[in-house]
Swiss-Prot record:
A motif (DEAD box) lies at residues 241-244. Residues 1-74 are annotated as: Disordered. This is DEAD-box ATP-dependent RNA helicase 31. InterPro entries: DEAD/DEAH_box_helicase_dom, Helicase_ATP-bd, Helicase_C-like, P-loop_NTPase, RNA-helicase_DEAD-box_CS, RNA_helicase_DEAD_Q_motif. Residues 327-478 form the Helicase C-terminal domain. Residues 110-293 form the Helicase ATP-binding domain. CDD domains: DEADc_MSS116, SF2_C_DEAD. It comes from Oryza sativa subsp. japonica (Rice). Belongs to the DEAD box helicase family.
């Protein structure tokens, strides 16, 4: 049906979807020059001394570089867990979890963390960093005096802060696995989308030495749960996972409040895929001056995205649903154990695409922030354990969530930036496995390709859509609820209105939105509430209907 051979010229070429709403995003405390170049540079001949997180010279011994994952099991190092100074019970848990050799990230970070040092680790997702910070935390708790059962408010010893519910749930599950032979140590999970009263009861009646949380819900407990602030005064280790993502989602103020509520004499671990200025500023606030910076992403190392076969397709909006259907059916026919993630721009568009693909009789699940947490947990678990399934997702699945053996990632519409493209793509090609990625753009979204021109992405020829496919997709679209189309249109309008390239020209934006409306099979663009249009700065723009 579809021929995705390379075009002749290229044949030689190798809505914000958040969980817990942040309480605010403050202006940068220092300079606003982005990037990492002033933090730590890769060593070179005759290079100047490394610059520390505080901008002061440090010895080269203070920075650890390590290799990154390659093909097969090369993401594993030769170092075994039983060579590390872990207690016998923890080692039994590691072995029961099926771990024998450390990943490169674990090899680089574990010995330093076990010494009690504050550590900022630059580490990519899918490299074993969760185990790298959990094992030392478990060791700290295991060496503390036993909890007095009669104590009304026993201290919480470890706090792990994750940007999304899925990541928090994953970290808590990993902790429970590693704690198999530490029955007296308990892990509790506090995340948005669940009843606070239930969490309060669990923390009161069950052991809670390790608390895994999303920032918004943790702040809620600090403010509303009796005795919770007192329990936090016993914290020995604070872990900020996916720190750059936490800040991208606007949780800076919440993080500052959390840090202020904890004792100063503690160990702080911060893991981040990138280390921009915002992350460095959090280090100033949360970490000791003699912190260790461990860089596990060497200059020139093979990135996850370089292992993934990448293509982009440029097509008008009215052809994109048919192209998506063809891409998926072709992939399914070629891969008996297919496992696909389709990323969409907003939660409402995600819902619409999932409904359409379901009408087309594909095996589809959807996941986004508008779904209840219990549903999201169930779907995430099902997709993780299944084959022969398509997950239509907003960006709740873009980072950190480890879905094994994903064979294809499709991105519909322009990502917000280069980093988002890479993190979405990183759901496939993990741990040395192969994978494919396809970016589906409209002609007016081609500008984005300039930001990823250094990546090994090639242009696929525009596939021909046969009449049968076109009719099948149009029929399925006709069965999609009109209300869902209206909500998707409004969300689409909001997403592209906030895009600095497309949203600048409001008249052109409305024209494109109405093109999207027609691609949904609507004769007239849906009416949008006047208040919403006013907030978008789109009132009185010709072509829009208000209500």
């Amino acid at each position: 049906m579809f021929d995705f051979g390379l075009s002749e010229d290229d044949s030689e070429l190798g809505e914000v979807d958040e969980d817990d709403g942040p309480s605010g995003f403050e202006d940068d405390l220092f300079d606003d020059e982005g990037g990492e170049k002033n933090l730590v540079e890769s060593p070179a001949k005759n290079s100047a001394p490394f610059e520390s997180i505080k901008g002061e010279p440090i010895d080269q011994e203070g920075v650890v570089h390590t290799r990154e994952s390659g093909g097969g099991d090369s993401y594993l190092s030769q170092t075994r867990f039983d060579e590390c100074s872990l207690s016998p019970l923890t080692l039994k848990g590691v072995k029961a979890a099926g771990y024998e050799r450390m990943t490169a990230v674990q090899e680089a970070t574990l010995p330093i963390i076990l010494k009690g040092k504050d550590v900022l680790a630059k580490a990519k997702t899918g490299t074993g960093k969760t185990v790298a910070f959990l094992l030392p935390a478990i060791e700290v708790v295991s060496k503390l005096p036993p909890i007095d059962c009669d104590k009304k408010r026993p201290p919480i010893s470890v706090v792990v802060v994750c940007p999304t519910r899925e990541l928090a749930d994953q970290a808590a599950a990993e902790a429970n696995k590693l704690l198999k032979f530490h029955p007296s140590i308990g892990v509790q999970l506090v995340i948005g989308g669940t009843r606070m009263a239930l969490e309060q009861k669990r923390m009161h009646t069950n052991p809670c030495q390790i608390l895994v949380a999303t920032p918004g819900r943790l702040k809620d407990h600090m403010e509303n749960t009796p005795g919770f602030a007192t329990r936090l005064m016993g914290v020995k280790v604070l872990i900020l996972d996916e720190a750059d993502r936490l800040l991208d989602m606007g949780f800076r103020t919440d993080i500052e409040r959390i840090v202020a509520a904890l004792p100063k004499q503690r160990q702080t671990l911060l893991f981040s895929a990138t280390v921009p200025d915002e992350v460095r500023q959090v280090c100033h606030i949360a970490m000791k001056r003699d912190l260790e910076f461990v860089n596990t992403v060497e200059e020139g190392s093979e990135e996850t995205h370089s292992q993934v076969k990448q293509m982009h397709v440029v097509a008008p909006l009215d052809k994109q649903f048919s192209i998506l259907y063809g891409l998926l059916t072709d992939h399914i026919s070629e891969n008996v154990d297919y496992k696909v993630i389709v990323f969409c721009t907003t939660a409402k568009v995600t819902s619409l695409v999932a409904e359409l693909l379901s009408e087309l009789k594909l095996n589809v699940r959807e996941i986004h922030s508008r779904k209840p947490q219990s549903y999201r947990t169930r779907i995430s678990k099902e997709f993780k354990e299944s084959k022969g399934l398509i997950l239509v997702s907003s960006d709740v699945s873009a980072r950190g969530v480890d879905y094994p053996n994903v064979t294809l990632v499709v991105q519909m519409g322009v990502p917000t930036d280069r980093e988002q493209y890479i993190h979405r793509l990183g759901r496939t090609g993990r741990r040395g496995n192969e994978g494919s990625g396809i970016l589906l753009l409209a002609p007016w979204e081609e500008y984005f390709l300039r930001s990823i021109k250094d990546l090994p992405i090639t242009e696929a020829t525009l596939p021909l859509i046969d009449l049968d496919t076109k009719r099948k997709v149009e029929k399925a679209l006709a069965h999609v609820e009109v209300k869902d189309k209206e909500l998707a249109y409004q969300a689409w309008l909001g997403y592209y209105n906030s895009n600095k390239f497309i949203g600048r020209d409001k008249y052109q934006l409305v024209s494109l939105a109405n093109e999207f409306s027609r691609s949904l099979g609507l004769n007239n663009p849906p009416a949008v509430p006047k208040l919403v249009l006013r907030k978008m700065g789109l009132n009185n723009i010709p072509g829009l209907r208000s209500k």
